[in-house]
């Protein structure tokens, strides 16, 4: 595809796009290497993990709260881990995390997993996994590290507080899907 585009005169430049605007019938792409004008722009901005937004999530992101089991799972070797989510990724990554964690608790806000039963079954049957349905995170707290998690049953309203052992921490892995990285085109393209 690249060769074909180059045959038609397309130029490929490697730079981070930091801004985009329309000006005099052109798109102007702002980069650290300068501004570039074009009749058309193809965007491949990617996506990032969706944050749920519970109190403490932003504060402990990277300090106990993670979004990638294969990237960060090993940091929680021998520790308790919570997985937040009920979809495909949550079910599969919870099973993966059992390689490192002492125990995995999955918190699902719905009455059951939302992924295919065949995907959910290994998580439901795993001896190191507990599945709590109708359950939502209330808040995550700590000091420089994550120390406690409060979650509640959204049917009964009962709140449960998990506290890490004295001087220890634990992990929370959030699997709530992905958000497209569209900040660059806000106000230019209808989203």
Predicted segments, located by residue:
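Aromatic/hydrophobic pocket-lining residues that form π-stacking "cages" and hydrophobic walls in ligand
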Residues: 1
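A Rossmann-like FAD-binding core segment of flavoenzymes
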Residues: 5-7, 11-24, 28-31, 35-38, ...
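Short, conserved acidic/polar surface loops in the N-terminal third of protein domains
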Residues: 24-27, 40, 51-57
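Helix-enriched interaction subdomains in cytosolic or periplasmic regions
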Residues: 37-38, 43, 48
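Hydrophobic anchor at the start of a short beta-strand
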Residues: 41, 81, 104
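Redox-cofactor binding/interface segments in oxidoreductases and associated redox assembly factors
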Residues: 43-45, 83, 174-175
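Glycine-rich dinucleotide-binding loop and its adjacent helix/turn
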Residues: 47-88, 92-100
